[in-house]
Amino acid sequence: MNKFFILLFALLCFGCNSSQRYSNDLIQKGEKHFKNLRQLTFSGENAEAYFNLDGTKLIYQAHDGDSLCDQIYIMDIESGVSEMVSTGEGTTTCSYFEYPKTKKFIYASTHLGSKSCPEKPDYSRGYVW
């Protein structure tokens, strides 16, 4: 009977452990600076991402197979749901939340000049913005 209570106590102690364990394949072997790393986007090309002040939202530019023009999205970090907040026309870049309130945001866009995507630059001589 005594062994039963000891076993039950041990199971309860280990079962109630609240510390999260991260099985994180994104962290490279030998990395000393990350404890955990979480991938937030899973499709398309995503770039220039910035968190709002309290870390609950992420603003970023992205495009997928439907369009080769980057558009601006805001993601709710907890749910992972993203919403396009730019016009969907032209191409966009350089989005930021207004600080410190972060209720507004700003970004650059070509949509007033043309609703279509601009021609892709020649990358043969290196990066072109």
Tell me what each language-model feature is.
Residues G55-I59, F105-I106:
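Hydrophobic beta-strand positions that form the internal "hydrophobic ladder"
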